[in-house]
A protein has these predicted regions:
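Positively charged, small/polar-rich N-terminal and surface patches that mediate targeting and assembly
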Residues: 1-3
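Conserved PLP-enzyme active-site core in the AAT-like
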Residues: 5-233
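Conserved C-terminal alpha-helix-loop-beta "cap" of PLP-dependent enzymes
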Residues: 231, 235-333
């Protein structure tokens, strides 16, 4: 497949009117690169683990960071801004993750989609963690869904890519969704050149699309197994995983996410830092390819903090749990 065919294949997968593939390090960088969030616009975002990307990536925009990712928080941050769905603007943007932020929050995308239209806001969803397999933001009310394709490419892409998908604007009974039509007009007018993707890179993405469902189900299933192990482990605390009833968004997540609750789990160490745990583990947990087959750990609050974010691979969760258990027990004796 060439780039055009890959974009068409992703559009079919995402239920999108149109898709643009970009080379970008992450979703906020891709949104900035698109050029559709323009000077004078207001961008309201829940991204407490990605604040720098928003504060530095949108020059001339009024960037407002909110917490929690609730309708009330977004509405309050939008007060006094006279937004329009005309292509000329000015535009009000609401940005959330389908799964994201500290605690792996799952916003109520349906409620946000309805409220965004009432406020003349354009709802943008970073769907990277859940993926197109695990969430359908465009169906739920987003006008734009962006997804970093590391996991789609099984960690094998030589560059980082993001897919930007715009919602269809045609509703039932020949009605037009003004918000989606506005987003499409902005994307059409952004003047972004078609991505130059060599055949080897295109092949990685094509093969990833072909195997996506099976691999993502494996990631989701292993994340659930590891979350249940961690929730029962007395050596860690505050396990955050949308599939656990203890998660603050568990009820919402059951109606927003599909095929499970995503590939990610967060937890806190007890009287240990993330750096100490990393030193006790093999380097593979930190250096394995993002989105690849091996389970990967990161420290979203830094190595001096106690928070660990785990992205389940397709490896054996019993082996991963055993390695983690041994490392934690060893550290407890020091």
């Amino acid at each position: 497949m060439d780039v055009q065919q890959l974009e068409e294949a992703w559009a079919l997968r995402a239920g999108a009117r149109e898709v643009r593939l970009l080379a970008a390090s992450h979703v906020p960088a891709a949104l900035s690169q698109l050029g559709i969030v323009r000077p004078g616009d207001r961008l309201v975002a829940f991204a407490d683990d990605f604040t720098d990307a928003f504060e530095r990536g949108f020059d001339g925009c009024d960037v407002v960071l909110v917490d929690p990712p609730s309708v009330a928080a977004f509405a309050a941050a939008s007060e006094g801004y006279d937004a329009s769905f005309d292509a000329e603007g000015p535009h009000l943007w609401w940005f959330v993750n389908s799964i994201g932020g500290f605690g792996l929050r799952v916003p109520d995308l349906r409620a946000l989609g309805r409220a965004a239209r009432e406020a003349h806001a354009l709802l943008v969803v970073d769907n990277t963690v859940a993926s197109a397999f695990g969430c359908d933001p465009l169906r739920l009310g987003a006008v734009l869904s962006l997804e970093a394709l590391d996991r789609v490419c099984a960690g094998k892409a030589p560059r980082k890519f993001v897919a930007a998908s715009v919602a269809r604007s045609q509703l039932k009974r020949h009605r037009v969704d003004a918000a989606a039509e506005c987003a499409h007009a902005l994307l059409e007018g952004c003047g972004l050149a078609k991505l130059d993707m060599p055949a080897d890179e295109a092949g990685v993405l094509e093969r990833g699309l072909d195997s996506l469902d099976v691999r993502m189900q494996a990631h989701f299933d292993r994340a659930r197994a590891l979350a249940e192990y961690l929730a029962a482990n007395e050596m860690v605390r505050n396990v955050r995983y949308p599939g656990l009833s203890s998660h603050p968004d568990h009820v919402v997540a059951t109606g927003i996410l599909e095929h499970g609750f995503g590939p990610a789990v967060e937890f806190d160490l007890i009287e240990l830092s993330a750096g100490e745990l990393f030193d006790a583990l093999s380097g593979e947990f930190r250096t394995s390819l993002a989105g690849g087959a091996a389970t990967r750990l990161s420290a979203p609050r830094g190595k001096q903090g106690s928070t660990i974010r785990l992205f389940a691979g397709t490896d054996n969760p019993l082996v991963v749990a055993s390695v983690l258990d041994n490392a934690l027990r060893k550290l407890a004796t020091l």
